[in-house]
């Protein structure tokens, strides 16, 4: 119920029109797992980063903000995990990696090429498990982190 209310409020936020529209479009598309790789690659090819983020968020049951942070982080480890969690194949991940490296000079295409085997070695199930806390509400995630820190102290 809380998530539905937050989505409803986000849809009415004037400052987030593009993001809200991308989320609505991704929901309307309702990409099936076999359609997702092509849609993600095509959205980046068309320079529709907001749609790419929304499609990824929907596929992984993440908030748009979490998915955006993952995609825009120049250290792309979480992105590669997210793409594996969505069960993307080598060709799709390579196309996405190349597109992001071409668009952002901070991303190193040679380093990405060196990582592709390691990326593909991670199973989709292991990637989903590694990212599982990201689908939780941000306040709940923060509370979990505080508990973990308190236990370590």
Show the residue positions of the predicted features.
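Alpha-helical scaffold segments
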Residues: 1-153
């Amino acid at each position: 119920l809380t998530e539905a209310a937050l989505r409803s409020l986000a849809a009415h936020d004037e400052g987030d029109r593009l993001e809200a529209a991308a989320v609505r479009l991704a929901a309307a598309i309702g990409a099936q797992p076999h359609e997702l790789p092509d849609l993600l690659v095509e959205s980046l090819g068309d320079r529709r980063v907001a749609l790419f983020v929304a499609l990824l968020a929907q596929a992984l049951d993440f908030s748009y903000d979490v998915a955006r942070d993952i995609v825009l982080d120049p250290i792309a480890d979480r992105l590669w995990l997210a793409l594996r969690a969505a069960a993307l194949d080598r060709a799709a991940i390579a196309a996405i990696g190349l597109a992001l490296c071409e668009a952002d000079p901070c991303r190193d295409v040679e380093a990405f090429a060196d990582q592709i085997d390691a990326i593909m070695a991670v199973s989709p199930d292991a990637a989903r498990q590694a990212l599982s806390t990201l689908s939780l509400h941000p306040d709940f995630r923060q509370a979990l982190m505080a508990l973990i820190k308190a236990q370590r102290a």
